[in-house]
Regions:
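Surface-exposed peri-terminal alpha-helical interaction modules
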Residues: 3-145
């Protein structure tokens, strides 16, 4: 795969978060590590309590600066040939008429009535369905999209 030059996206943050580690993992197409890094950066955005517990409350996500969410999303889009990112997930969710069950099936988080198990049953490369990752909004029922 063609690696895009690092820093082809301005890494903007309203909360002085450094997105370079995420950019590097995505540039290497190490999507599993990038997914974990995405959650880590989102916990940093939420503050020290979230960093300690390593997951997010729905209410914390509501207060995220749009600048940071756009930076994370743009990095995912750019390094996945447009397949992965919050905006892709949102587009698919809207295309299902905001039906969560259809959405989860479409992006491969569920097969029939069975949830895809983390991490081994997820597909961590570009052969995954569109919108398959990042998983951050699956964890603890957090919806970023």
């Amino acid at each position: 795969p063609n690696q895009l030059p690092i820093h082809s996206v301005p890494l903007l943050s309203d909360r002085h978060i450094d997105y370079t580690p995420l950019e590097q993992l995505l540039a290497q197409q190490d999507f599993q590590a990038a997914d974990r890094m995405t959650l880590q950066k989102m916990c940093e955005l939420a503050g020290p309590d979230a960093v300690q517990r390593k997951w997010l409350y729905f209410t914390e996500v509501e207060n995220f600066p749009i600048t940071d969410l756009q930076t994370i999303n743009t990095l995912w889009l750019l390094h996945s040939e447009g397949k992965f990112g919050f905006s892709v997930q949102r587009e698919i969710w809207l295309s299902t008429g905001k039906n969560w069950d259809k959405f989860w099936l479409k992006i491969g988080w569920k097969t029939g009535n069975t949830w895809t198990r983390y991490p081994n049953e997820f597909t961590w490369d570009l052969s995954a369905p569109r919108g398959h990752i990042p998983l951050s909004n699956q964890l603890r029922g957090v919806r970023v999209i």
